[in-house]
């Protein structure tokens, strides 16, 4: 589906997950609230729609690109603690709070909002050491031994294998515990976005004439050549800045 339809689907899911009955119980029990898994090419707008959904639902948002993190920052740092088991003192390994879980609590304190979205990007592109942690996160909604707080909806995003060589395929057990939404770029949807955000007319006019250039990734002798929706928006910002500088530059003497 296109990015606009995906946004609507996710927004409805978030609203359903956070809805409660007259005595405050979730209409959908937490165990039935499947994490949402977005799969789509880079630069299509996955992170942007999460920001929009959080704003429209008046909830908090914590977003992480997981490839920027290590196992220690995701799970926490280990430390040794003495425990008594069966009358014997034993040294056991425990962990500090996950940096990601700590960020959720910090967002709740900062915004005053108890509900939110925890968005993990590039979840299927993690290193080998972090991959089991991500599987546990999707299956159990935990990082290490710490659960994601109640009232927080988990949304993850990844890239299909054709766009990223480091992609790791999820097994059937994991896929059976998530709600997967596949996203494809669609020019007409992006054009609506471009008009609403007043992107540079040179960009929109060019894509009217060359729609086949909107989203393209190919390999040639020089390596991977690509253009994405994000790239067109960045170009628009550059052109608008150039226009502003041109109009405000002093005239030559």
For each of these PLM feature ranges, what is it?
Residues 2-207:
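AAA+ P-loop NTPase catalytic core and its hallmark functional loops
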Residues 12-16, 238, 248:
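A generic secondary-structure signal
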Residues 56, 140, 238-241, 251:
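Active-site catalytic microenvironments for nucleophilic, acid-base chemistry
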Residues 198-246:
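Conserved AAA+ ATPase small/helical "lid" subdomain
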Residues 247-253:
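Conserved small/polar residues in nucleotide/adenosyl-binding loops
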